[in-house]
């Protein structure tokens, strides 16, 4: 077993060897290096062929038509394209957008930008378990609501929102529905023929593909429309200009094909490791809280708060495992996770949370090592904590008045 142990698969995944092998075929002079948009010679035709195959592979994972897949530089761009693109296209109908407070920053900040452009955005609260109250969502919908954007799987908690029901609600009211599926592709079965979703964002690097490539599903029937955000040569049916990065797209396509092939195997493997991790940590430690809901979440993300331990010192104490507190995009700030705050967790618990994310290459040995390391580290840090001592003595910390110096 090699240290440090990687348990941050929700931040990014290593590229699968099978994927890297395919990508290598599309880079050098004796490989498939042509520009897929070059129509006048074989180099272009061959590149176009593998790009078409990649498009089909991405579409197959979600049961879409390949013509509904628009390649982008990642889920952040896909979210921007869907939300800004749809809001601008449908603005004559209305300027109201609904999203949730626990969305990824790529959705929240895109909505903030639209507010600066005169749109009105409702950021919905979630329940204590991280899920939306669908009745409240229905009550928030108005005649001038043009778009609802709700993520499929939350990147910090792993909870799975009820996309099927939300889709029905939106379709009934003729509201466009966007779903950020960066964390659910390859982990939850997605069938866009069954789901009433208009736009769906995907990322390559969350599914053992390369970074820097993503996709946006844009429904054809009934047709979903959007305004392009990137202008140029009219690539991707005018929705996203820019030379197609053949090796990146082939990487994403292969990753999605492998995800489909290995779905059952990955799910069983990760579910068993999740149980081992949760049982190991939650069984004989007190003041340990599971964030989210265990019965409606993906097995790969486990978010736990350890009371009476400061998050930053905890991360430093467990430097032999690569985990995160909050999401990678915001872990550079010392603010507590806005997602955990939205669940109603107090600052102390939000600060002492750790997200373990398990993946295809995680082993039982690594999980067992992690459990032991967590137990020892938490025990050691709590021994140094005066708050833990007071708690042990039965003092209600909320009733303590601290002296101000």
Curated annotation (Swiss-Prot):
Primary location group: cytoplasm
GO annotation, biological process: [2Fe-2S] cluster assembly
GO terms assigned for molecular function: 2 iron, 2 sulfur cluster binding; cysteine desulfurase activity; metal ion binding; pyridoxal phosphate binding
Leading EC class: transferase
Tagged with keyword Isomerase: no
Record EC number: 2.8.1.7
Subcellular location: Cytoplasm
Pfam families linked: Aminotran_5
Example of a GO cellular component annotation carried by this entry: L-cysteine desulfurase complex
Highest taxon of source: Bacteria
Entry keyword annotation includes Iron-sulfur: yes
Keyword tags: 2Fe-2S, Cytoplasm, Iron, Iron-sulfur, Metal-binding, Pyridoxal phosphate, Transferase
Entries under PROSITE patterns matching the protein: AA_TRANSFER_CLASS_5
The protein's role, per its UniProt record: Master enzyme that delivers sulfur to a number of partners involved in Fe-S cluster assembly, tRNA modification or cofactor biosynthesis. Catalyzes the removal of elemental sulfur atoms from cysteine to produce alanine. Functions as a sulfur delivery protein for Fe-S cluster synthesis onto IscU, an Fe-S scaffold assembly protein, as well as other S acceptor proteins.
Family: Belongs to the class-V pyridoxal-phosphate-dependent aminotransferase family. NifS/IscS subfamily.
Subunit details: Homodimer. Forms a heterotetramer with IscU, interacts with other sulfur acceptors.
Protein name listed in UniProt: Cysteine desulfurase IscS
Organism of origin: Pseudoalteromonas translucida (strain TAC 125)
């Amino acid at each position: 077993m090699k240290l440090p142990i990687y348990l941050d698969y929700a931040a990014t995944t290593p590229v699968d060897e099978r994927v890297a092998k395919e990508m290598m075929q599309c880079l050098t002079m004796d490989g498939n290096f042509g520009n897929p948009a070059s129509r006048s010679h074989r180099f272009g035709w061959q590149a176009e062929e593998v790009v078409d195959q990649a498009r089909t592979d991405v579409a197959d994972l979600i049961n879409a038509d390949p013509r509904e897949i628009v390649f982008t530089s990642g889920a952040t761009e896909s979210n921007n394209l869907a939300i800004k693109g749809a809001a601008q296209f449908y603005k004559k109908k209305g300027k109201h957008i609904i999203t949730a407070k626990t969305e990824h920053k790529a959705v929240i900040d895109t909505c903030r930008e639209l507010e600066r452009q005169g749109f009105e955005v409702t950021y919905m609260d979630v329940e204590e378990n991280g899920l939306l109250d669908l009745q409240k969502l229905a009550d928030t919908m108005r005649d001038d609501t043009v778009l609802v954007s709700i993520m499929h799987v939350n990147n910090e908690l792993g909870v799975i929102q009820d996309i099927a029901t939300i889709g029905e609600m939106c379709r009934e009211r003729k509201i466009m529905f966007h779903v950020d599926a960066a964390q659910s592709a390859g982990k939850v079965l997605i069938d866009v023929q069954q789901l009433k979703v208009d736009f769906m964002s995907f990322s390559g690097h969350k599914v053992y593909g390369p970074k820097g490539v993503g996709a946006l599903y844009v429904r054809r029937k009934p047709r979903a429309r959007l305004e392009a955000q990137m202008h140029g040569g009219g690539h991707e049916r005018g929705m996203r200009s820019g030379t197609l990065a053949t090796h990146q797209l082939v990487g994403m396509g292969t990753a999605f094909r492998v995800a489909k092939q290995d779905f059952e195997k990955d799910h069983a493997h990760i579910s068993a490791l999740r149980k081992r991790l949760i049982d190991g940590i939650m069984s004989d430690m007190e003041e340990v809280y599971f964030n989210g809901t265990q019965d409606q979440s993906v097995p790969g993300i486990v978010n736990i708060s350890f009371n009476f331990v400061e998050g930053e010192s905890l991360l430093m104490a467990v430097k032999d495992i690569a985990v995160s507190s909050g999401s990678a995009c915001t872990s550079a700030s010392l603010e507590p996770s806005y997602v955990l705050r939205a669940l109603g967790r107090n600052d102390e618990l939000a600060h002492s949370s750790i997200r373990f994310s398990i993946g295809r290459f995680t082993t039982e040995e690594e999980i067992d090592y992690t459990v032991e390391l967590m137990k020892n580290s938490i025990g050691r840090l709590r021994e140094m904590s005066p708050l833990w001592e007071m708690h042990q003595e039965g003092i209600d910390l909320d009733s303590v008045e601290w002296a101000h110096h």
